[in-house]
Amino acid sequence: MTWQQRIERALDERQQTDAFRRRLPVSHGAGRWLEREGERWLNFSSNDYLGLSQHAGIIAAWQQGAERYGVGSGGSGHVSGYSEAHRALEEELADWLGYPRALLFISGFAANQALVAALAEKEDRIVADRLSHASLLEAASLSPAQLRRFAHNDPQQLAQLLAKPLDGLQLVVTEGIFSMDGDSAPLADIQAAARSAGALLLVDDAHGIGAIGDEGRGSCHTQAVRPELLVVTFGKAFGVSGAAVLCSESMADYLLQFARHLIYSTAMPPAQAVALSAALRVIRSDEGQQRRETLAARIRQFRAGMGDVSLGLTDSVSAIQPLIVGDNARALSLACRLREAGCWATAIRPPTVPVGSARLRLTLTAAHQAEDINRLLEALHGHGE
């Protein structure tokens, strides 16, 4: 078999199972509306949970940062790319979340991969929730450590796996709010199991940070849990992009020595760090609380409006409201019909989700108005969902 034959076979398999992914260029993809080729739809696919990507103050902060620092960092943070703006943001994040240190990364994917790659050795074991993000599971499977997956949100099975004999150390991996199901992890029980076994706990709270909790502190703060490694990302509630790892002083120093994704990547633009500091100020403010309350109201409105036809909904009270339809072709068809009704929703299919669980991943935001949710509900009811 040649490389071209292998590539064509893989593409054919995706085509035959209605799992082929395509990107559609848009003129505006965040906020209340999605705009493309002169048309617009109510946007139920964006992760811009608080609507901050369109916030005038945050946009102005990025512009001011670019005027001061330029549009790029110029290098790795280990060389010349670590600016005063980066340091200020790290200190603000650490203060907000109650950790000694924060380290910035260019993406949540990079942060998760960096942690696993820097920590895991051959004699170690990584025990991960089976529905953890692809960045975590891929890093774990590629690491020299053994990978064991526990049943989704099952602390009892986690404890059983942690109790098995091992020469090395253990790392427990989970998410605060799961990206495809929208449900929350029982973090207190997971932390108890990890601590009982002497394991480190890594929580990726990409979809909780900023969107829930006091001052938007996220899933861990809400559940009174303090993992040794907390990953927060800035492409959701913050409305920007990038990520940070919250940890101890010694762990931060260790990662600065051994986290290759951090050492060998160009640092995020300083202007982006300025914008993120502005976003954090909004998140912590009364305005941020009002936006979280608006988001919570839209979630309640949607779930109440689904009523008796909510059997396909997962048990989610987050901004992520997946409607599981099972078949790939049906998910694509339903997404198409919703767009015809003026609502943009994305069909999520295997391998992103398990076979037989294709779904519409509906995301609600503080930018939505009550009438927008009503329109979505009417479209879903009109198509028998």
From Swiss-Prot:
GO terms for molecular function: 8-amino-7-oxononanoate synthase activity; pyridoxal phosphate binding. It is an enzyme of class 2 (transferase). Pathway: Cofactor biosynthesis; biotin biosynthesis. Its EC number is 2.3.1.47. The modification N6-(pyridoxal phosphate)lysine is found at residue 236. It catalyses: 6-carboxyhexanoyl-[ACP] + L-alanine + H(+) = (8S)-8-amino-7-oxononanoate + holo-[ACP] + CO2. Pyridoxal 5'-phosphate binds at residues 108-109, 179, 207, 233. InterPro entries: Aminotrans_II_pyridoxalP_BS, Aminotransferase_I/II_large, AON_synthase_class-II, AONS_Archaea/Proteobacteria, AONS_Proteobacteria, PyrdxlP-dep_Trfase, PyrdxlP-dep_Trfase_major, PyrdxlP-dep_Trfase_small. Its cofactor is pyridoxal 5'-phosphate. Substrate binds at residues 21, 133, 352. SUPFAM superfamilies: PLP-dependent transferases (SSF53383). The keyword Transferase applies. PROSITE patterns: AA_TRANSFER_CLASS_2. One of its GO terms (biological process) is biotin biosynthetic process. Keywords: Biotin biosynthesis, Pyridoxal phosphate, Transferase. Belongs to the class-II pyridoxal-phosphate-dependent aminotransferase family. BioF subfamily. Catalyzes the decarboxylative condensation of pimeloyl-[acyl-carrier protein] and L-alanine to produce 8-amino-7-oxononanoate (AON), [acyl-carrier protein], and carbon dioxide. Homodimer. This is 8-amino-7-oxononanoate synthase. It comes from Klebsiella pneumoniae (strain 342). The lineage of its organism: Bacteria, Pseudomonadati, Pseudomonadota, Gammaproteobacteria, Enterobacterales.
